[in-house]
């Protein structure tokens, strides 16, 4: 596996692979890799001939007071994991390489509607930052396909819309969330949890599962269901940012008639913000 730090080196390496007739797969990350990230790399190796990963902690998607400065940087360990997983090329640029003219005047990419509400409400500008950096990375790599985790469900919806609306010839694949044995979704931010908080954290997924089970059993009073489960989160010591049932494709608030649903949650446990979701299609046999 080669590691490159400049756009010029990246494009040269990808061009060589293309000249050999290889299909290109891309997995963008912010580093501090865990088993969830590695599952994306593994999936890519099964689908394409040449796998590119990126590690870039993107300042444009962090708001004031968020954890940009303390976000873990673990490049050497990440390189070892990527190599073992079969990654062919790692792009690990600096902020200056990604934004050579600074960020203040940087052209921004915005995906309206899908970026609003949920994480977009509590993290203003976040999805604009995501859409902008992903657009830049897609233009740099020009992959045949790109793979993202479904844990960031709203982000995945934004990226699908971005690719569709801007006519990018890239197949977007969403991979199921990888979980610990107790159900907690794997996340780079889980490392911020204390031992006591980590013991409490699985209640997030249990809450989603409980809501899904109630819906499967015929419950359609979504506001009452959400209110009861929100209280359960609070009783466990979490501070819910949101807990909502949405239509899985449009992300609009779900109605009792909808069949393709996603239950989404964001909640603070101590100072750590945890997000998770559970996709529930009532027309798909269990």
UniProtKB/Swiss-Prot annotation:
Pathway: Cofactor biosynthesis; (R)-pantothenate biosynthesis; (R)-pantothenate from (R)-pantoate and beta-alanine: step 1/1
Binding site for beta-alanine: 61
Keywords for the protein's UniProt record, in alphabetical order: ATP-binding, Cytoplasm, Ligase, Nucleotide-binding, Pantothenate biosynthesis
Keyword Nucleotide-binding among UniProt keywords: yes
Protein name, entry field: Pantothenate synthetase
Note: The reaction proceeds by a bi uni uni bi ping pong mechanism.
HAMAP family with a match to the protein in the record: PanC
Chain positions recorded as ATP binding sites: 30-37, 149-152, 178, 186-189
Pfam family, one: Pantoate_ligase
Ligase as UniProt keyword: yes
Single biological process term from Gene Ontology: pantothenate biosynthetic process
Residues involved in (R)-pantoate binding: 61, 155
Subcellular location: Cytoplasm
This protein's GO CC annotations: cytosol
The organism's place on the tree of life at top rank: Bacteria
Family statement: Belongs to the pantothenate synthetase family.
Quaternary structure note: Homodimer.
UniProt-recorded Gene Ontology molecular function terms: ATP binding; pantoate-beta-alanine ligase activity
Cited function: Catalyzes the condensation of pantoate with beta-alanine in an ATP-dependent reaction via a pantoyl-adenylate intermediate.
Gene: panC
Active-site residues per Swiss-Prot or TrEMBL entry: 37 (proton donor)
Catalytic activity reported: (R)-pantoate + beta-alanine + ATP = (R)-pantothenate + AMP + diphosphate + H(+)
NCBIfam families in the cross-refs: panC (TIGR00018)
């Amino acid at each position: 596996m080669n590691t490159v730090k400049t756009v010029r080196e990246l494009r040269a390496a990808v061009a060589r692979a293309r000249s050999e007739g290889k299909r290109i797969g891309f997995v963008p990350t912010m580093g501090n890799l865990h088993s969830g990230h590695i599952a994306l790399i593994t999936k890519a190796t099964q689908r394409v001939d040449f796998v590119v990963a990126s590690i870039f902690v993107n300042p444009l998607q962090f708001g004031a007071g968020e954890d940009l400065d303390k976000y873990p940087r673990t490049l050497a360990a990440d390189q070892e994991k990527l190599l073992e997983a079969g990654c062919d090329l790692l792009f690990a640029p600096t902020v200056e390489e990604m934004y050579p003219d600074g960020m203040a005047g940087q052209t921004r990419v915005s995906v309206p509607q899908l970026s609003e509400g949920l994480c977009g409400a509590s993290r203003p500008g976040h999805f604009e930052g995501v859409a902008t950096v992903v657009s830049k990375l897609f233009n740099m790599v020009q992959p045949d396909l790109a793979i993202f985790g479904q844990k960031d469900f709203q982000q995945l919806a934004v990226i699908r819309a971005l690719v569709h609306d801007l006519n990018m010839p890239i197949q977007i694949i969403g991979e199921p969330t990888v979980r610990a044995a107790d159900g907690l979704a794997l996340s780079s931010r889980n490392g911020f949890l204390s031992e006591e908080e980590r013991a409490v954290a699985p209640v997030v997924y249990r809450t989603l599962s409980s809501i899904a089970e109630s819906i499967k059993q015929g419950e359609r009073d979504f506001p009452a269901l959400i209110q009861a489960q929100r209280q359960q989160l609070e009783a466990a010591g979490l501070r819910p940012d949101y807990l909502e049932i949405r239509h899985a494709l449009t992300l609009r608030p779900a109605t009792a008639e909808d069949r393709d649903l996603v239950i989404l949650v964001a909640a603070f446990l101590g100072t750590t913000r945890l997000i998770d979701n559970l996709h529930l299609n009532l027309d798909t046999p269990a």
